[in-house]
Amino acid sequence: MMWEACAEKTKAMGGKIEMGCSVTRCSYDEVSSSWTVEYKDREGGLHTIEAEHVISSAPMREMVGGLTPAVSERTKRAAESLKYRDFLTVMLILTDRHMFDDNWIYIHDPSVKVGRVQNFRSWSPEMVPDPDKVCYGLEYFCFEHDGLWGSNDDALIELARRELIQIGLAKEGDVVDGTVVRQKKAYPVYDDHYARHVATIRQELDDRYPNLHLVGRNGMHKYNNQDHAMMTAMLCVENVLANTKLYDLWQVNADAEYHEMGDEVSDEKNGFGLRLVPTRVAAAPELAPEG
């Protein structure tokens, strides 16, 4: 799998991966332009890391709130105003009746709560090793602590089983097992004021914390697809290695566009080798700062 291979390559190059940890504070030293990152491991132990750069895919709201020295009150209010939509998936293992081969299908039936159904075997047969079974992921869009989110796993599995039969993708007795995965802050909310809030946050972070780099959907509060979210991290690494802003990460969007800063030179000369996904475009207008 891709992420297992990524982890092995990281460790082979001397990197260390800490799982199940919670960052509690990011402290910036303006004199040395360096960071001290404090985190808690899964056993509750406290640790500290010194860093020249911090790359964050954590939700922008929480990242801004954990910075030391603290941001201005204006930026703090902007961060606290950002909203998120949460998400849960009910995975059902059932008899394979070859109902559909797509990776996913959207459900528009108002009589059910499910919004999308994933077919995990269509992503990779290795995800469903039993050839006689299929695993469907029924996706529900919700808010943390609402009725759906707060339902226990057994109730959610029963709801998903019943709705899968109702929409014609299963029959009684097909489902043999199920589990639930909840994902907080899966979607950044684009309300009337989010762009202003993000622009306000970006402006102060760029001015006061130049070696803090925001990437990914939550980190940038930007509704990127997974491949575009990963591209922001890849281009961010190029910026860090070059010690300059070669790429404007905020131009990576749903059309796989980005803007390379500076002279127009070939990828062969730069050696970046990232041309298969994004294409070069003119810089988009900056978001207006909060007035």
Annotate each language-model stretch with its function.
Residues 4, 234-237:
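Predominant activation on well-ordered alpha-helical scaffold segments within soluble catalytic domains
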Residues 12, 199-203, 288-289:
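Proteins with a high burden of low-complexity, intrinsically disordered sequence enriched in S/T/G/P/A and R
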